[in-house]
Amino acid sequence: MFELENEKALLTLLNGTLKVQEGETVVVSGTADPATNKVTLSGVTPVVAKSGESANDSDVTIASVPDQLVRVVDSNDETKELQTVGNLEIGKSVFNAKGLQVAPADAAAGVVLNLVDNSKITLIGGETEDSGVLVDGNNNAVKTHVVVGDGSALQLGMAGNAGKQMASFGTVEVQGKLDVAGNGLDTTRYGYEELKASHANAEVNLSNASILASTATLEKGAVNVLNATAHIGTLNPTGGTLFIDPAYVKIENLSGDTFGSSLLVGDGSVVEIGSIADLQTKAAEAGLNPAAFGNGFTVASGESMLALGKAVALGAGGKIVVDAGVDKSGAIGGVPVGDSAYFGNKSLLVVDSAIASGDGAIRANSAADTITVKKDAKLYLVDAKANGTYTIASGFGNTSSTVEGWNGDALITNRLVNAERIAGTDGSVTVKTTAKRASVLYPGISIPNTLDRMIGDKQNDVNSGNAGIKFLSRALEPQFLAEGDVIPTLDGAAQLAYAGGVQSSTITVAQAPVRAIQDHLSLAGKVAQKGTNLHENGFDLWANAIYGSNRTRDFSAGSLDAGYNSDFAGGVIGGDWTFDAGAGKGRVGLALNVGAGDTKSRGDFNSTKNDFDFWGMSLYGGWSMDNVNVVADLGYSASKNELKQDIPSSLGLCGRIKGDVDSSVITAGVKAEYMVKTDVLDVMPHVGVRYMAVKTDSFTTKLDMGGDLFHTDSDLQHVWQFPVGVNLSKTIETESGWKVKPQADLSVVPAAGDTKTKIDVRTPGVNASDSMKRRVMDTTSFDGVFGVEVQKDNVSFGLGYNIQASEHQTGQGVTASFMYKF
């Protein structure tokens, strides 16, 4: 604590904060001209005046009150009424204050604050961005225009200040010096309608703060943006220097015909003129090391970056230097840069291809201007189309020997576009593009025709209104998607149904009720092989609970491996009639089934989930005589599949795609059995044939946020299976009358026909389609069944476990059965 006591006042500073005693006011005195509403403060320092005491009567002065508003009053006014001000001129004065309190003559027009005669004033502002350094009697911000005269200085903010430092201004014209001394990008924010450097001695230093200027005019002098961010609506660059080191500067528009200032982009700095989407991502893809910085980003030390979404035409004296080593004088390593355009090692120029036509992105003022591009300088040409010529720079002197970089790995564009930089004697730097074949760049990709056509027809556009083209274009642009994610993302979306195991799960749930029917009609399912049993003439009612779990792995899908895990559960209920049929017994019946399940992808596709429901019906019949049994069935099964697939969030498309797919199976089969009874085991060889027509309906793959990506045509597979096997069983009768029959069945199941599904896919708006075949089942599988059935009187129960195995697939199932004989 510091105390200064005299006979008139007690002044207390506690932890840097002024404690004004009751009845005291901090004031500065000015001389007013009522005719012009001009108030002049000359050689003043704030004083603390007691109640009833004028500014002249106080001899307690304090030059620094950054936490206090200072009232501008008449020197002899004991009431300390605010002076009416239209123009406030401060000369020969040095002091710091939070702000000045005045009575504005015209609130709409505001007040002009004019610093002259070597004044050095520091003002802080308030807590919000609409605060002011001039306020009225109610502490409301007064619109403030500022002129900092040659030799004078205005400082906004204090680097060591603990509080927020914010204010808005009208026009601020700097002929002397303006310093923004910030204490952080979030806590120091100043906004300007216009910020203008208009004198050769003008110096503007914007440090550790966030700056917003609707208009900035650079005529003379220097504007230095240091460890700060600046957002400029319109820049009028007719002279002077704009130096950035390190900082982020965003310039929405350029006014005037030419760029007559020197733009020096220094160490770690980023300047964006116009707008380029996802610029920070592009910087990373080009090999720089960006890091978020306020409302923008900077790059690593030793790097520098300029992004042009609008063309720049250099005027007389205009210059662009992008090099981490440049200083505010425009020299690198102490040597002044003589070129009108200079791009150093580890610099990055990002150019929107839309401005790289005609005179190009950067146009020289005359052939006397030179351009240098160092060997390790990089160029990112955004959204370039194939078979085009893009002008990066034009109008310079001979560029053939001074432009070394911007080629090879230092030239970045769309993945399916070849680009070559050409620097010629005509003073231009151009990039010529040709199309790469998708199948060459990405062997095994599923949609090469679609990609080649889109690129060849120059349809690629990362902001296209066509969702499919936008998706494909973004997947091919490095800033949206890492190289290793391109094929999984494109192929997964183009093969959504296959990635979600639609065909496989449809076949599996269609086969489950067939297995239940065949078990029900099998000789091996008759618990009693001698005498009366449940299968005498009359009506049987039976039901099975079914559960299945199937795993598929390592199916080839172009350059990817595909697989999925599928689980389902459901039930089958049936009824049939047994009757005499010549020398044997005949049976006919009807069964219904229903269930639900889900499939989750595994392997290289992006994560895909299929939630499905299924239902079906079967007509079946059989004929048996002694040890011979023939079973036949005709069935229909329908599935509804709800598919969702994750896509990388970096695409900016809400991270998910979806599709609804209907699928079905019509199946017919015949199975013949022959039972050989022995005292030890009953041995029953069996053979069969089964036909399946597997249909996958056409569907549309969409973004979860809306918009069609792909249309997939319907497909019909014709599959034949030829199971051959043997069943081993034995009936055991207990003293209580229960009959127990354990059994085991082993089969081999060859398959023929369309064991692969055909996928025909196209993107709406692209005049091409792609076709591919993907395996759904192996050509040979092995089937094992193990179970037990118990029966007493007219009731039978059963429990079974089955397993299917092949090279790429493993399935397991559990059935629980019940039958009642009427």
Name each region found by the language model.
Residues 1-3, 8, 67-71, 79, ...:
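Extracellular beta-strand/loop-rich repeat segments of large surface/secreted proteins
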Residues 2-22, 27-32, 42, 106, ...:
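Extracellular, surface-exposed repeat/solenoid domains
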Residues 5, 14, 19-21, 29, ...:
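Feature marks extracellular polysaccharide-active and adherence modules
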Residues 9, 37, 45, 58, ...:
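Serine/threonine-enriched low-complexity regions in disordered or flexible coil/loop segments
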Residues 16, 26-28, 41, 60, ...:
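A composition-driven surface/loop motif
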Residues 20, 39-98, 103-105, 544-546:
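N-terminal segments that cap or nucleate solenoid repeat domains
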Residues 472-678, 683, 798-819:
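Outer membrane beta-barrel translocator domains of Type V secretion systems
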Residues 618, 622, 677-678, 693, ...:
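Outer membrane beta-barrel transmembrane domains
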